[in-house]
Amino acid sequence: MKSNKLPSHHGRQQKIKGKYPNQTIKLLVERASLRNFSDKKIPPRILQYILKAGIHAPTGGNLQPYSIIKVEKTKIKRKLAKLCWQKFIGDAPINLLFCIDWHRLERWAKLEVAPFTATSSFRHFWISFQDTLIGAQNICTAADSLGLGSVYIGTSLEFIPQLRKMFKLPRGVFPVVLLCLGYAKKPPLPRKKLGVDVIVHNEKYQELSDTKLLNAFNGKYPGLKVAINQDRLKRIEKVCRDVAGEKFARKCLARIKKNGYISPVQYYFGLHYVANLMPTDNEKFLKLMEKFGFNWFKKYSPYKGKK
């Protein structure tokens, strides 16, 4: 069904029916992002359980190269909500900012007179990024298990300098993701997903046929057809032209007019996560990393001073 209103970019909701071997599997399969928080506060004891679950997540070498900034003050939460364009951030009783943190480990190395190059190493950056997100997801799961909900805030990426100033982040500490925690006014329904048969590959990468691939995405976004209007056509045309030239822009518009609607993938990369803007700030982000004390993208030169 076509709608003049732009659909949620989070996809279709669904009620999941089925039997589970235990409550943990049920919780994981039916997990959904929460954006309507109630006024109920999180009891300190419950919050401690949740945070403890986070810090016990696996990390490379058990180094725990991340820190979590806990935000409870209403004034700061509202400032975050305005900054990240998400009103519900101000409604959530707790916001957690997850940061890669090599500052703490570098201080430890200096105090114990140990060599340290982690902020200049892509290997360390890559593992610490994974570690930070694994810790965040542990906290999400712990929160769900205790009757709370959560939602990740991707737009925090756009305001890294402001976050650094707000939370007094030292060099070697880089914000990765913001997470809101709280109780639901109304429990959210989970979103439809691609199936195990699409995401999991046996022994090696296996290309689906075009038909199977299209069927898989049609199953994930059933009936999602965005209505055509001149503004949307104009916007998509510009994105296509910027990304792949005039010929591709004409081809995309012809497909839209032939179908009689804008498809989900045309909506995602033509109107929402617009493909001509998403790569534009790559250099800016690298410069930001350098300001935060990270140099893993530069050639490393070993010490050449006096031995």
Where are these regions (language model features)?
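Acidic, surface-exposed loops and disordered segments
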Residues: 1-307
